[in-house]
Amino acid sequence: MASHIVGYPRMGPKRELKFALESFWDGKSSAEDLEKVATDLRASIWKQMADAGIKYIPSNTFSYYDQVLDTAAMLGAVPERYSWTGGEIGFSTYFSMARGNATVPAMEMTKWFDTNYHFIVPELGPNTKFSYSSHKAVNEYKEAKALGVDTVPVLVGPVSYLLLSKPAKGVEKSFALLSLLSSILPVYKEVIAELKAAGATWIQFDEPTLVLDLDSHQLAAFSAAYTELESALSGLNVLIETYFADIPAESYKTLTSLNSVTAYGFDLIRGAKTLDLIKSAGFPSGKYLFAGVVDGRNIWADDLAASLTTLESLEAIVGKDKLVVSTSCSLMHTAVDLVNETKLDSEIKSWLAFAAQKVVEVNALAKALAGQKDEAYFAANAAAQASRRSSPRVTNEEVQKAAAALKGSDHRRATNVSARLDAQQKKLNLPVLPTTTIGSFPQTVELRRVRREYKAKKISEEEYISAIKEEISKVVKIQEELDIDVLVHGEPERNDMVEYFGEQLSGFAFTANGWVQSYGSRCVKPPIIYGDVSRPNPMTVFWSKLAQSMTSRPMKGMLTGPVTILNWSFVRNDQPRFETCYQIALAIKKEVEDLEAGGIQVIQIDEAALREGLPLRKAEHAFYLDWAVHSFRITNCGVQDTTQIHTHMCYSNFNDIIHSIINMDADVITIENSRSDEKLLSVFREGVKYGAGIGPGVYDIHSPRIPSTEEIADRVNKMLAVLDTNILWVNPDCGLKTRKYNEVKPALTNMVSAAKLIRTQLASAK
């Protein structure tokens, strides 16, 4: 019985690649130094899988930045602005495409399906010339072979590559990207020929777009592509790998009818209906099924007994020698190795498996199917599963009851938004076009040092409070000097907008090295939600009250919303996600009510990640949006009309969920908008009625560039063309945490000046 891993984390157990990349980008190390770190990482990963007994070990899943960018490099699809003149693509061109350089901007980055990983979006058009320009896939196959490891080279499939691309600047938005199929397939044929010549016997094409809602034209492209590649692929075993959702019946039909394909990989964790499809529609005889039964997107130990039952039912359909045990997707979406978690509670640790442990699980399942079951390993796993099911740390009956009572009720504030805004204005007395910021202010080296030393118990609580108090006082003073209307305390006490709350809620655990790649060298360390969530004590009230006592202007209380906490964590898999979300919402509700009782009149509940959690298939959108929006409303349904509830959302694509945003019933919403002005404003231009306050970001905080007063005023005027004067707010598009004060002060000065300039113009026009 064979085993397979779809892909593996690239960063290394201690983020070795991250530090090597950043050192190279900063000019502190050479290309050779970077390549040495990468070579060592690849070798250790291949050795680890070979030692674990994995039969089908992937190669070319390593990347210096992103696998879609690697594919663009392989195809020589370099946008003109990078002045590439041909030949093998080196680091200079590659990293310019990923990150931009002094003279040209980077390519766009967007989320990889519904994960928290981001890929570089290829820019294509009718004049894009393709040529074989990066031999990475072949080189890495040969590299592994020289180490005595025969691997399965992995390529992003040609159809998914095109479907994930976008028309380049200046190309019609309606340009048919799939029309380029005949132009890219010759390059794929060259790569395949080289891999065959190097001795490859298997090849894996990742075609995850097969799980999306595809039309007949798009499905026909799959048939056309793999029919065209048929002769090039002859003599090779070909695996088409899909992941992240159920495969629709039509896509399954298309996929299983491809002659050139030997094997199909399915995600059986997020794709439970695919199991039914295999059973009802049948499976082509003589073909391999790579069954993704070990979750590549979470950190929970697999329930081996349950997986074995699933595999045995599949074995009866596809045959013993044609079933391969696999992961549901690449393991790059989970943490690297549990061995590095020396401080994690031992009971919780027994419930977990990171990438290295999942490799062992896959092999244990394959051996069990082959009649070589490791009884001790399975018994330990069963004991851990039982402990997790019965542990009193997981279940809090009071929380369970409170969350169950939420179902079926609506949780809306009693008064409509226009009446609430009137009541709030009487109390807050804000000018037209009120100014505010999103929450965080720059986090200096000194500030990070204070937090680090307090955590390590190197400074006392008194010293810590004194240092944070001083920082808040500085931030309040700056905002008053700038004449901002609604202030923030700057969040100097917070390391991360999710971790800060998770550390104070029950049901959360934290890792020391549970890093997951987000994009390029950037990694995130998601908290683990292992049990019922509750709030033992107030979390932010002390700091918010302190900040409000320093000013007569309104001070915003700052909270992270339940959907964002959920979407940016590793979530328990023993109950539906919405139940966990409702529990978090109830905890945040208590905090909102305590802030209000403490005299905080404006409370912001960030839902930066609400859009991110949207399922891949349209049929599932309504259910998700219903519970996500309901969770937000739960947090603030009990406040008075005079308390103003703000929310903040990130990323651009709101047009398809605008009605859900309105349904959140916030008093004011601020939106990250500066990179996609027209996209957002077009919604309102098309007649969507929005009655609450709204603050589309007037400048991009992700850039060090300082916008002029005129530029911001021009942007505000464009907004006023489609939005009422009395609902528009003026604010940056995101928090200022990553910027420096010498960038923040002039940018905010110009922002306030622009608001005042337009107020004057509006007053004189009356």
Swiss-Prot record:
Lineage: Eukaryota, Viridiplantae, Streptophyta, Embryophyta, Tracheophyta
SUPFAM superfamilies referenced in this protein's UniProt entry, alphabetically: UROD/MetE-like
Protein name listed in UniProt: 5-methyltetrahydropteroyltriglutamate--homocysteine methyltransferase 1
InterPro entries: Cbl-indep_Met_Synth_N, Cobalamin-indep_Met_synthase, Met_Synth_C/arc, UROD/MetE-like_sf
Gene3D superfamilies given in the database record: 3.20.20.210
GO annotation terms (biological process): methionine biosynthetic process; methylation
Top-rank lineage group of the source organism: Eukaryota
Gene Ontology CC: cytosol
Cofactor binding, per record: Binds 2 Zn(2+) ions per subunit.
Binding site for L-methionine: I438, G439, S440, E491, D606
EC numbers on record: 2.1.1.14
Organism: Oryza sativa subsp. japonica (Rice)
